[in-house]
């Protein structure tokens, strides 16, 4: 396609329990908007956002998964092509925090070994309803050697920072190539196999 | 519920027949009152026999037998009462189960991992996971294609692609659709892209 509108394509994935705000986090980042009504994601969806890092235009294709158990067989098939995974929990929902180890295990089982991981404690604007101390999030992130942010899609806290940091971490691992030798293909986004494109 | 009126009737009969009436009753309908009536009748007749020591001997045994009969009658009526309550409870239980059963149909026979689907429910589950997977894949594919087309349209609108190159560009797009299976078009595409966007990448780097 006449699309050298970007230099690199990174594929990211959002996972975590149902209702923690994965879709809202993504919506804030891609459209800078927030919607309070809860609409459960059906299976899997994605959004595109192009950012500029170190003079490179990086197209982020961000896959948003349904947290509900009944979609897991569909969503886990999308782990494989992800270069970065954001694991989201809700600081007002203890269960969503307890399930982090389960999600991390899912990553180990289904994602690429060198996938860049990040932990997000969302809804940090709701401090009066907080049940997960920030320290606990930091601790579990440290134990697994991954980055951690507390975010709020509603109050727009740390959302862009989280995505840009994850993209930077992936960029750092990306071998430098002659920019125009990239031939990335976003039109096959639906299939896992579509991502064997030479984008990394 | 049926017994008390019956008993009353019997008592009335008994009253009419005098204490002797108790001796004519069915042993299964005997009450403690009847036993006392029988005791009264027998005691009276024993007294009439005089004070022979053998009669006295016999009297002790008769009293003992009557006491035993009294105990058995009391015990029996208690058991009947308990059984009657038990029967009423079970009747209610059966009634309830029958009502549930007619609502839930054959559910009782299903295994632990089975589910009953209400065929009249318009929102009942009816598609398979594979079907959902296919639809989602197609949706996401179309969505990404739309994004590509939108970007391309933006290029035309902003004048990045000169109008005279329009037809060529369009032909190129046709080739792009089948790009995955056509490696040669890749090269062609890249050169065109490079031509069209060289000033852009120059600006970026």
Curated annotation (Swiss-Prot), chain A:
Mg(2+) binds at residues 23, 41, 64. Expressed in the hippocampus. Expressed in neutrophils (at protein level). Expressed in the testis (at protein level). Regulated by guanine nucleotide exchange factors (GEFs) DENND4C and RABIF which promote the exchange of bound GDP for free GTP. Regulated by GTPase activating proteins (GAPs) including TBC1D21 which increase the GTP hydrolysis activity. Inhibited by GDP dissociation inhibitors GDI1 and GDI2 which prevent Rab-GDP dissociation. It is a lipid-anchor. It catalyses: GTP + H2O = GDP + phosphate + H(+). There is a cross-link at residues 102, 136, 154 (Glycyl lysine isopeptide (Lys-Gly) (interchain with G-Cter in ubiquitin)). SUPFAM superfamilies: P-loop containing nucleoside triphosphate hydrolases. GO terms for biological process: antigen processing and presentation; axonogenesis; cellular response to insulin stimulus; endoplasmic reticulum tubular network organization; endosomal transport; establishment of neuroblast polarity; establishment of protein localization to endoplasmic reticulum membrane; establishment of protein localization to membrane. The modification Phosphothreonine is found at residue 73. The keyword Transport applies. Its EC number is 3.6.5.2. A motif (Switch 2) lies at residues 64-81. It is found in: Cytoplasmic vesicle membrane; Golgi apparatus membrane; Golgi apparatus, trans-Golgi network membrane; Endosome membrane. It holds the Pfam family Ras. Keywords: Acetylation, Cell projection, Cytoplasm, Cytoplasmic vesicle, Cytoskeleton, Endoplasmic reticulum, Endosome, Golgi apparatus, GTP-binding, Hydrolase, Isopeptide bond, Lipoprotein, Lysosome, Membrane, Neurodegeneration, Nucleotide-binding, Phosphoprotein, Prenylation, Protein transport, Transport, Ubl conjugation. Belongs to the small GTPase superfamily. Rab family. Interacts with MYO5A; mediates the transport to the plasma membrane of SLC2A4/GLUT4 storage vesicles. Interacts with GDI1 and with GDI2; negatively regulates RAB10 association with membranes and activation. Interacts (GDP-bound form) with LLGL1; the interaction is direct and promotes RAB10 association with membranes and activation through competition with the Rab inhibitor GDI1. Interacts with EXOC4; probably associates with the exocyst. Switch 1, switch 2 and the interswitch regions are characteristic of Rab GTPases and mediate the interactions with Rab downstream effectors. The switch regions undergo conformational changes upon nucleotide binding which drives interaction with specific sets of effector proteins, with most effectors only binding to GTP-bound Rab. PANTHER family: LD44762P. The small GTPases Rab are key regulators of intracellular membrane trafficking, from the formation of transport vesicles to their fusion with membranes. Rabs cycle between an inactive GDP-bound form and an active GTP-bound form that is able to recruit to membranes different set of downstream effectors directly responsible for vesicle formation, movement, tethering and fusion. That Rab is mainly involved in the biosynthetic transport of proteins from the Golgi to the plasma membrane. Regulates, for instance, SLC2A4/GLUT4 glucose transporter-enriched vesicles delivery to the plasma membrane. This is Ras-related protein Rab-10. It comes from Homo sapiens.
């Amino acid at each position: 396609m006449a699309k050298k509108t970007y230099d690199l394509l990174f594929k990211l994935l959002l996972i975590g329990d149902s209702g923690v705000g994965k879709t809202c986090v993504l919506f804030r980042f891609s459209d800078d908007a927030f919607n309070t009504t809860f609409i459960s994601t059906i299976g899997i969806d994605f959004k595109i956002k192009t950012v500029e890092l170190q003079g490179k235009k990086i197209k982020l294709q961000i896959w948003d998964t349904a947290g509900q158990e009944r979609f897991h067989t569909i969503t886990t098939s999308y782990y494989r092509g992800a270069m970065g995974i954001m694991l989201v929990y809700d600081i007002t929902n203890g269960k969503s925090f307890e399930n982090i180890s389960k999600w991390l295990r899912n990553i180990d089982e289904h994602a690429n070994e060198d996938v860049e991981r990040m932990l997000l404690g969302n809804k940090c604007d709701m401090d009066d309803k907080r049940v997960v101390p920030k320290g606990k999030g930091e601790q579990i992130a440290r134990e697994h050697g991954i980055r951690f942010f507390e975010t709020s899609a509603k109050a727009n806290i740390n959302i862009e920072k989280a995505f840009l940091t994850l993209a930077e971490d992936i960029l750092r691992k990306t071998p430098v190539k002659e920019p125009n030798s990239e031939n990335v293909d976003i039109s096959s986004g639906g299939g896992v196999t579509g991502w064997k494109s030479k984008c990394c | 519920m049926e017994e008390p009126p019956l008993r009353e009737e019997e008592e009335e009969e008994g009253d009419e027949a005098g204490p002797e009436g108790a001796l004519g009753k069915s042993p299964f309908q005997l009450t403690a009152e009847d036993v006392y009536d029988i005791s009264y009748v027998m005691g009276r007749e024993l007294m009439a026999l005089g004070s022979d020591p053998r009669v006295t001997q016999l009297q002790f045994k008769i009293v003992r037998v009557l006491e035993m009969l009294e105990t058995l009658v009391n015990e029996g009526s208690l058991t009947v009462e308990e059984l009657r309550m038990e029967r009423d409870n079970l009747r209610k239980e059966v009634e309830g189960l029958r009502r549930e059963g007619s609502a839930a149909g054959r559910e009782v026979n299903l295994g632990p991992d089975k589910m009953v689907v209400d065929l009249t429910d318009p929102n009942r589950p009816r598609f398979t996971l594979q079907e959902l997977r296919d639809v989602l894949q197609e949706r996401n594919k179309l969505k990404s294609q739309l994004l590509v087309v939108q970007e391309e349209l933006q290029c035309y609108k902003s004048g990045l692609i000169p109008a005279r190159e329009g037809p060529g560009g369009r032909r190129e797009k046709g080739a792009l659709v089948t790009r995955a299976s056509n490696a040669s078009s890749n090269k062609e595409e890249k050169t065109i892209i490079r031509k069209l966007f060289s000033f852009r990448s120059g600006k970026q780097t």
